[in-house]
Amino acid sequence: MVELFKQNIRTNIRQSSKGNQLKWENEGTWYKADYTGYEGLAEYVISHLLKYTNLNEDEYVLYEPEQIKYKRQIYKGVRSRTFIDGDWQIITLERLFKNVYNESLTSVLWHISDVKERLEFLVNAIKKITGLNNWGEYICRLFTIDAFFLNEDRHMHNIAVLMNGKGDYK
């Protein structure tokens, strides 16, 4: 069991449609508490199954079960290594698009009725902003994994890129 404190909390203000897990970072390790009771188990199982795919080790994060004590409560959850180094930060696609075009990516995508055109728009828009030429391959892998594991909570607030202080992306 690990005990975590308020200064370690990293929970975002924006909640997903499934609620919001408490998240902390402490000494190079990320911790996520279950919100509905199964998120940690799902992340553990899926991350360990990904070891047997053709994904490289730097393309996913392994999760391990963890009991987390925060304030007076004990949570079931998971831990993983920190995947953000130095001055890199996570920026969601929604925030990235809003910063550049001053409009909601989600709203723009919902106005495109054809699924293929919607995916093409998403890939081209993010490639244009970030210069990430392999973005299409990445997003197709992500959606394939989501479909295989029945992830029903994918949206533009939980797909992200990494950006550093110089404006480089990965």
Regions found by a protein language model. Give the residues of each.
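Conserved ATP-binding subdomain of kinase catalytic cores across diverse folds
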Residues: M1-T106
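Histidine (H) residue identity feature
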Residues: H48, H111, H155-H157
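Acidic-enriched, low-complexity/disordered segments with a strong bias for Aspartate over Glutamate
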Residues: D34, D58, D85-D87, D114, ...
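Conserved kinase catalytic-core segment
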Residues: E117-K170
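Alpha-helical structural motif
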Residues: A42, K76, V115-R118, W135
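Active-site-proximal helix-loop-helix substrate-binding element of RNase H-like nuclease domains
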Residues: N99-K127
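Low-complexity, intrinsically disordered regions enriched in charged/polar residues
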Residues: D87-I91, I112-K116, E120, N133
